[in-house]
Amino acid sequence: MTDRTPFWRSGLISRNRRAIGLLFAAVLALTVVADAQTLPSAAAPAAIEVRAEPVSAFDVRDPSRRQFGLLEFRGGLALRSSYKNFGGMSAIRVASDGEHFIALSDKGWWFRGRIVYEGSRPNGIVEAEMAPILGPDGQPLAARGWYDTESIAEDGGTLYVGIERVHQIVRFNYGKEGLFARGRPIPPPPGFRSLPFNRGLEALVFVPKGLPLGGTLIAISERGLDAAGNISGFLLGGPSPGGFAVRRSSSYDVSDAALLPGGDVLLLERKLSWTSGLNVRIRRIGLGEIKPGATVDGPVLLEADLGYEIDNMEGLSVHRNAGGETVLTLISDDNFLPFQRTLLLQFTLAEP
């Protein structure tokens, strides 16, 4: 367990799941109002200090438990910073070295740094920087109302960022220009602009050459439903552009997605229930099943409620470390609220 137990882990609140559900539902509703924000100005990246409190156990009820199906908990961090723009983390990509990362705030900010480890456990964040995400004119995306940045995908030195509220994807030459890169909008696929408000683009995955769908950017909505009630997805570029669907089950919505080294897609999903509060799960989808017109589904690797060390988990990244282990990194969106947390959690996936 964490060294300092958050107030909602107290006996009274942890037993009152209905109250927790109401709390989180209210929080998500308030985020719409909170978007009336002070807009950032284009400026050099700011070096920031990030304080990290260890999360030593994932199962609050059984702190000694490390194995969760095919996933083994490595450790985690609860992150805090006095920097005013820190928070709201909605996506993350961790480099192949397992240390350097870049993340997004849903208010239109980059957050990058380096994870330091004690053995295999995350132990802190160093070399942290934040900067506003820039549009094609060199001004912050937020200045044009494009601040709901929710997803990120990587193709070598190119980054793709999805902006939910305006149903837009922008491309950055991050490898050459770093945090000063300007985003260039790419043409949206058919049906993209008709996604519902605040339930639009939530996950991006780029498929590298050599895999099925190589060269394709996969985009998945949070809860843009087709006629059958399944979640809408899109294939941009690559050999087979078009639309597909992810089978929706148990009222879960999509939060993020990441590609496994072998090619399958992991979906991070989230559900709010009036009875059980907040729930998250990770589902595995075969890449070969994703094609225009298909409805895809797959096994659940992890499902967790508030009896586990979770918050509003929104970002998922996968990398293979020097030892050949497949490592999952998750990050949460604290909605800039003092009673929520920015959690960074890591698991090792045992490949079947």
Regions from the PLM with identified roles:
Residues 2, 7-8, 21, 29-352:
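Sequence/structural signature of beta-propeller domains
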Residues 17-25:
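Sec-dependent signal peptide recognition
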